[in-house]
């Protein structure tokens, strides 16, 4: 058992006290400088500390004592330039920006404006960085107070930051030792018999915010003590308050999330060959088709028609006839029966997919030319336009969470497809698109290395 283990207490079923809590200022503290002994200064200023008190310290004081002050020019321009450099140095990733304001994640995992780089309550020739490890700083301060005063206290180190959804800033815990930073009510039942399913209270943040009412910002009162809370030490730290990575539903600001979505839209599309049975809302496909039809087309024409095979019997009959034709074609190539069966089986995806759409090129509005060369070029131009619309449809489906796979089979049976679907003779089928929710989650595609695929002249 470690020394810290011996001071841990059993968890309480309730984080609130239902009784009086006091918040006491710690007066008489000096102006701290690098190398100062914070524990000794607090012990001298607050010899009245008791077991169970929570000592709440503004992070700026800790930064000063730990030498996290950076010399800065006193002129506004130079000071601001250094501040921007320090913010960049402390930044792990940018979540959002508005004007010159940056909301970032720093090396501690904290998400806040300006990475915690601060020019308040320090000399004009300095800027302050956050403590390197606020949880460790809290633990050291707790041990120091125990050694000097013989008391078992909890310690919370705070910083000021804004909140999503709400105006204004509040103090939160960025370092903690000696108290349960979270209190989970999951499974508890209120007096009406309702189970509290997801309620988890950020106790350390509540303590931090409460003491700011005493500490303030201009009072030169960087430390306050909460008395009457009787905290439970479960070994947790302020790091347990951070929600990072996939658990964070607000990982980016709105503008940045939209930008990332635009950048990733193309990479979301990949060929999905196994689908779940989940039904697809018709509006999703209709909206995706509407977007796909904005693809570029020659002469302001509409050279694309999408035929949605919604009637099961129509789809099955068409696919059966295409499979028969495919077998005959392969047999005429003298392929063995097992090879033919294997090739034909690739078309099973069009039977199994929840939805199938066939894209057609229609030559409405195509220019007529007397020579074969220009007529062929005009035809190619219309084919390319359909290809653009097909790709646009696949991407539009992907951004709605729908998987798809383009299959070229109808191109090899154009007359048969037109006859089965009773379509005009100049409509050219250009494959088929299987659509559905992917059976397994899919990742973003990796961009292809350009290398010799992009030529420069």
From Swiss-Prot:
It comes from the Bacteria. Gene3D superfamilies: CofE-like, CofE-like domain, NADH Oxidase. GO terms for molecular function: coenzyme F420-0:L-glutamate ligase activity; coenzyme F420-1:gamma-L-glutamate ligase activity; GTP binding; metal ion binding; oxidoreductase activity, acting on the CH-CH group of donors, with a flavin as acceptor. A divalent metal cation 2 binds at residue 160. Keywords: GTP-binding, Ligase, Magnesium, Manganese, Metal-binding, Multifunctional enzyme, Nucleotide-binding, Oxidoreductase, Potassium. GTP binds at residues 29-32, 59, 64, 121. Bifunctional enzyme that catalyzes the GTP-dependent successive addition of multiple gamma-linked L-glutamates to the L-lactyl phosphodiester of 7,8-didemethyl-8-hydroxy-5-deazariboflavin (F420-0) to form polyglutamated F420 derivatives, and the FMNH2-dependent reduction of dehydro-F420-0 to form F420-0. This is Bifunctional F420 biosynthesis protein FbiB. It comes from Mycobacterium leprae (strain TN).
